[in-house]
């Protein structure tokens, strides 16, 4: 996402729990076109935890769309930080990146 989220794991000062994770949806997510069409838009999201994500045999990391260049550029620095949840993917040995940036 534009802020470097991974699933519904939003940027924060510390890493979330390693298991299934429930989070309040960021305003940018709540305003996404796929959610706005819902009669009762969700306010929380459930996503895999970091351990489950990193336990995958292979990860397909897709970064496309407008407004993501800053987060993508920060990701390319390889600094692993909870302020950029997608950065945790640098710890996985087999990530395939697909991007239009």
Task: Set out the residue ranges of the language-model regions.
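Conserved phosphate- and dinucleotide-binding cores of soluble alpha/beta proteins
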Residues: 2-101
């Amino acid at each position: 996402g534009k802020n470097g989220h991974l699933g519904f794991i939003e940027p924060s000062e510390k890493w979330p729990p390693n298991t299934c994770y429930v989070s309040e949806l960021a305003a940018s997510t709540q305003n996404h076109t796929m959610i706005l069409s819902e009669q009762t838009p969700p306010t929380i999201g459930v996503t895999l935890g970091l351990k489950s994500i990193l336990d995958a045999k292979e990860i397909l990391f897709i970064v496309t769309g407008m407004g993501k260049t800053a987060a993508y550029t920060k990701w390319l620095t390889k600094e692993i930080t909870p302020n950029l949840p997608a950065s945790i993917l640098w710890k996985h040995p087999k990530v395939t990146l697909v991007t239009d940036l």
